């Protein structure tokens, strides 16, 4: 196995994942996961599909992350890793889907409308 690649998106974040057989090392934008995501919660979000299938020490993962914030980036990486694992073994898809790792979250920021200060907010209305 050379390497498997997959893309995951969440909000404004895009994650490109390259999965290869190895010892469980995760590198994000040329930095270790502990340095890129200091929060253990965000590290856990990224590792969730690997822990669910119990293959955390089986693959080395290289991730390129762009755009968005920390939370969006971690969830984009989670989706990309889940998609890559399904490419390797399609039998894992039901287990990952039941946890919601395969589903792309479609919620994105609503655009600002003209004639309003924000997407939904209106300027103060004066009756008289």
Swiss-Prot record:
Residues 106-128 are annotated as: Disordered. One of its GO terms (molecular function) is structural constituent of ribosome. PROSITE patterns: RIBOSOMAL_S9. GO terms for biological process: translation. Keywords: Ribonucleoprotein, Ribosomal protein. Residues 113-128 have a biased composition (Basic residues). It holds the Pfam family Ribosomal_S9. One of its GO terms (cellular component) is cytosolic small ribosomal subunit. InterPro entries: Ribosomal_Su5_D2-typ_SF, Ribosomal_uS9, Ribosomal_uS9_bac/plastid, Ribosomal_uS9_CS, Ribsml_uS5_D2-typ_fold_subgr. Disulfide bonds: none annotated. Belongs to the universal ribosomal protein uS9 family. HAMAP family: Ribosomal_uS9_B (MF_00532_B). This is Small ribosomal subunit protein uS9. It comes from Porphyromonas gingivalis (strain ATCC BAA-308 / W83).
